[in-house]
């Protein structure tokens, strides 16, 4: 019995090591970074007695992987620790809600860097979606982030400097430079 358990544990550890190696060695064109505070610090959208608390990070990550994955193919989050990438993109989300016109306003600011930390440019994407705060707000939020990411991606594709960086050789450990990025101020209550 002990040998079977030991064998099972060793196979489990071996499979984890192999899968971690596959993620690290996967070629990446764009590495995406979203700061931890966008995952941990929840924001509140409100209208009189109706309020909705949410984290921006997971919704933005889903939209970024979907949109940038379609446009630039090999895309990975810095959490996956890609071995190399041609461009590092730092995403900063913003969201607001106007209860009088029932509109969600999404904004994503993308700061693009080379793997060695040289800035390539800033791209701002905006989107609006109409919806009520008390009826499935997560769908409207996801639509706003998705629209803003499509706007950002279109601007990246139109930028000559960004396209030049995509043609360059990939740099090693692009996410190692994220410690040098400025720490943003905490966004209080979604203002």
Predicted regions mapped to residue ranges:
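Sec-dependent N-terminal signal peptides
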Residues: 4-14
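Short, solvent-exposed, polar/charged sequence segments at loop or secondary-structure edges
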Residues: 53-97, 184
